[in-house]
Amino acid sequence: MTFSFTATVLGSPRIGPNRELKKAVESYWAGRLDAEGLDALARDLRRRTWTSLRDAGLDSVPVNTFSYYDHVLDTAAMLGALPDRVAGIESDLDRYFAAARGNDTVAPLEMTRWFDTNYHYLVPEISPTTTFALDPSKVLRELEEARALDIPARPVVVGPVTFLLLSKAVGSDAPLLDRLDELVPLYADLLGRLAGAGADWVQIDEPALVADRNPKEIAAAKRAYDRLSGLELRPAILVASYFGSLGDALPAIASTGVEGIAIDLVAGSDTLATVPDLTRKHVVAGVVDGRNIWRTDLDAALASLGTLLGSTGSLAVSTSCSLLHVPYTLDAETGIDKALRSWLAFGTEKVREVVTLGTALTSGRESVDDEFALARAAASTRNTDRRLHDATVRARLDALTASDPGRSPAAERREAQSALSLPVLPTTTIGSYPQTTQIRVARAARRKGEIDEAEYLKRMRAEVADVVALQEKLDLDVLVHGEPERNDMVQYFAEQLDGFFATDNGWVQSYGSRCVRPPILYGDVRRSNPMTVEWITYAQSLTQRPVKGMLTGPVTILAWSFVRDDQPLADSANQVALAIRDETVDLQGAGIRIVQVDEPALRELLPLRAADQPGYLDWSVGAFRLATSGVSDSTQIHTHLCYSEFGEVIEAIARLDADVTSIEAARSHMEVLDDLSAVGFDLGVGPGVYDIHSPRVPGVEEIAASLREALKAVPVERLWVNPDCGLKTRGPAEVEASLRNLVDAAKLVRAEL
């Protein structure tokens, strides 16, 4: 009989507790570290991760969750589905990174958000000529490494249904799921090899099944797992779901011969008692939240587990999803107050909670009474802490009226904004400029106490002056100050708003080597002082051209933070919106004529099921409009959106009512413009004309061709010219070359009009 484990997690972080992987990968890209050195570091990171999970008490440890860049890209490589354009690159590793990042001659794969999280994956491209072929070397190697360390290893792979549903069809309109029969034999081969290598269990992730799926898709998934579970030589199969309820897919998967099903009981609401086939399954219950950082209510979690005991064959405790989405450990946080610390659980602490619940399930709650008592005490102090309830903030929210989130009609605003006297096809950038060595040195010196605040501010003002001078030299029309003072577009504001806490080492992976430190929104939000006015007005004093005020919108601040779970998201969004509204009014009062309120994460919080989406879109649009409706008609409001499948939220983008919307569109080849046209979008739009996530410098004619394509869908008087995202992560030389070509392309197309 297959061994049934009792405590596990669905995945773990891979960047390293001190971002070791990020630094090593970037050193490899820069030529400072060779492939052997990178491999040695990766092997050590895997060893440390697996042994810490085993030693914490997990009796099944996920492996193959490590990745140099992205686990979906790893799956494409495993299935022989990297794009043809990288085939000529000799090195496997360089071919992999070229698909992820591109190079001087190769465009990268598109990137988009992983379901409704702030992690982003590379979108595989599947064409009619794609010939799938199995390369199991990575997963087999990691299994071998783990077994050599006496790790109770459970290999993890992205499932065939999810892989196809998340991929992009190229050169054909046929549904990619029609090719499932081509993939199932490869997975069958993989299962046989894993069994031969000693795997007792394999976890096959199928999170795509928690979104709305039609009967044909569910039937296809059932057929696939009927075939895989019918194999004679294979490990036990755990089909893992997360980020929501399986719904109709649950009985379909339960009716197959797979031994286990992992279910998200934090984000989902599946009623297991209604699925009789689960009485023959090993159910892995995700009762510890893998996406947020709040301490688990152990009493409630154990009660939930208790209700499942009669509905399942056997039961294990787990996180609701991979711990990829939370920081490593609270131990690295030294500046956090005692009360707030007691309310939190990062990765290490969540593993401890899983083990505690597993012990309570198998040995009785009395065996872990102390842990349960600590959890109860933390919940009690959180419920009574005065920081969570600010009477002034609550009164202001209660006083809002239906007219507060509204502005004048767009035509009236356009007339008032004509005083800006901008040319057709005005050029601008999204906001941030490269974080130069000088910026990083100054920031580190201030942190170590080697320079005082006055010297730091002096150096940052010099950076602002350099960025303004560069933009004038390049002849851009609307300028930005470059954001040298900002370490992160959300954390910068969180550090200045009451109700937030910014961690020292709470790093999580956003994509590739890009890591972020999401702040913690734990209480009511209030702005005590202006946050950006001094920086923007200084930049404006250096030029006669308009300089944009740069703010982050309320939805993005929520999406890229760990948000309190004791009140509706809409309430927290409106609190943040009022703080941003006050800042826009202050910027206008200081003479700033254009204010950009970025909402790159608008799509990320969209619920996965259609029935839940209208409510979210109502409050998210309302929060943006509340944040931007305090200014006069003559102040031009911009917003920026990125990493999004805009078709699903395109009407909401129009409802934001921003005067100009810049959109990441370079990797998706301007597809979003057709969606905008279809909903009658009649405001300014700046589709990104080149991809800043790739180090390649686009040519003038390449950018001009993108502009000509955009003009087929957008009237010239409404089209803006900009990159598709901020320039923070790029090098100064490539930024200058790219922007020079952008301006030259705009001038070229203007001359053709």
Curated annotation (Swiss-Prot):
UniProt-listed InterPro entries: Cbl-indep_Met_Synth_N, Cobalamin-indep_Met_synthase, Met_Synth_C/arc, UROD/MetE-like_sf
Residues annotated as binding Zn(2+): H640, C642, E664, C725
Chain sites annotated for binding L-homocysteine: I430, G431, S432, E483, D598
Cofactor: Zn(2+)
Pathway where this protein functions: Amino-acid biosynthesis; L-methionine biosynthesis via de novo pathway; L-methionine from L-homocysteine (MetE route): step 1/1
The entry's keywords: Amino-acid biosynthesis, Metal-binding, Methionine biosynthesis, Methyltransferase, Repeat, Transferase, Zinc
Domain of life (superkingdom): Bacteria
Molecular-function GO terms, alphabetical: 5-methyltetrahydropteroyltriglutamate-homocysteine S-methyltransferase activity; zinc ion binding
Binding sites annotated in the UniProt record for 5-methyltetrahydropteroyltri-L-glutamate: R19, E20, L21, K22, R113, R514, C515, W560, E604
Gene Ontology biological process terms from the UniProt entry: methionine biosynthetic process; methylation
Note accompanying the cofactor annotation: Binds 1 zinc ion per subunit.
Residues where L-methionine binds: I430, G431, S432, E483, D598
Active site positions: H693
Reaction(s) catalysed (UniProt annotation): 5-methyltetrahydropteroyltri-L-glutamate + L-homocysteine = tetrahydropteroyltri-L-glutamate + L-methionine
EC number: 2.1.1.14
Family: Belongs to the vitamin-B12 independent methionine synthase family.
Function noted in UniProt: Catalyzes the transfer of a methyl group from 5-methyltetrahydrofolate to homocysteine resulting in methionine formation.
NCBIfam families for this protein: met_syn_B12ind (TIGR01371), PRK05222.1 (NF003556)
Protein known as: 5-methyltetrahydropteroyltriglutamate--homocysteine methyltransferase
Source organism of this protein record: Rhodococcus jostii (strain RHA1)
